[in-house]
């Protein structure tokens, strides 16, 4: 009998759509983490800065969850890449963050529907809920301006 190193059966390891979606999610979360650090520094009040830092902590958790899932499926470690530039202006940063969060919700929900991997479904669905909440905060701060 052959025992595999990977915790997932072969069909999950050979799911190129799931692997591609995880790679995109990992790079997106990594980019958001970088941009939200900058956005928090540009914040006009402590209250706003603290909320953006809380959102950033959620993104760090998402990155960890997606990276762990990717590693357990592929047996490989992924080095995330920043795929988006961070605006230098607070209002433009809020606008970019709001749009990115909304697009990410759609992407994560679609990724959850496209896979039969129950762990991945759960991770993508929970992250989508968080991203929608983040979008609401960014929209709120945009409307304050």
Swiss-Prot record:
Where does the source fall among the domains of life?
Bacteria
Q: Which residues form a coiled coil?
A: none
Q: Which InterPro entries match?
A: Ferritin-like_SF (IPR009078), Rr_diiron-bd_dom (IPR003251)
The molecular function GO annotations come to:
metal ion binding; oxidoreductase activity
Q: What is the protein's name according to its record?
A: Uncharacterized protein YhjR
Organism per entry = Bacillus subtilis (strain 168)
